[in-house]
Amino acid sequence: MSGKIQDGVAIRRMSDAILFFTNYTSRNLIDQRDITLSTLHTIRRNLGTCWSIALLNCWNETSSHAGVMRFILDIAFSLRFGDFTMLGACGNVDPFDDAGQIFLKSCKATGRNDSCFLTPSDNFGYYLVSFLNKEQLKCVVDMNVGIHNIEDIYVTRMESIMEFIYYYYTESGRDVVNWLEKLESADAGLAAHAKSKRLMRAEIDLIRREILERTRLFINNNRNSFHDHHRELVRRYRTIWADVISDGDVVEETSTEATTSAQHSTALSAELDEVDEYDHPNDGLLTFRREEDAASNLDSLLGSLSGEDAFQG
């Protein structure tokens, strides 16, 4: 199927995705699950097969970059067997003639320009495109067949997601200066959605720290899980991170993800407030809005899966 819509509608739909990830904070999928799933349900249905393109462009855009990464992190550390399907396309409708062009128009309409985009290396850029395109296809589960072996698919897809997170961690540590090449270095006078090199560097550093904290915590909390698929996932995560996280690095059993999240939030506020005072003395850059007009809550099926729209029958 292929249906094309007017640019005005297309821009609004793409802008909804940008806003969603601009507002997305760590653990939204856990702590604000109902409203997050409702909003995401609408966005994915509107974008259809352009979902991976929207994710790609939101990852590249500085104000929504952290939201995309934390959304992917929330999926990677979820114990719900169907959450990975949120990276899959919703339906097979292609609503836009040129999704990339629609994204650029959406950015222009909301005051974003070329200085609002990251510039990862060609190798990482190719990997990112390949990863998102692959997950858009492979994270869709056949309702007639896949539902019966959802646990096995869960382990395979989560391993793929964690491999991407690991690659992000290593590449952002090695090549972050080049990623920030197009960003402004001015101390003030930046557009509302722009971020200086210093501020974006601080955000990426915090994401990298969160990746390590949550990976250690997930391994620690689930290595003795009663569910064999969760134990298998822990084994694969440990293999992926073997050169970074050793057995001695695993946190104590008494630690909780909520504690880690609170510590991370405190660090985020302290570090970014310091940077923001220097780079953005007047704009409300770090004020996260909450959408109050989300659609009604999804069916309880979303408690274990990510909604019927993720499946193809």
UniProtKB/Swiss-Prot annotation:
The keyword Coiled coil does not apply. It comes from the Viruses. Keywords: Capsid protein, Host cytoplasm, Outer capsid protein, Virion. Pfam families: Phyto_Pns9_10 (PF05878). GO terms for cellular component: host cell cytoplasm; viral outer capsid. It is found in: Virion; Host cytoplasm. Belongs to the phytoreovirus minor outer capsid protein P9 family. Minor outer capsid protein. This is Minor outer capsid protein P9. It comes from Wound tumor virus (WTV). The gene is S11.
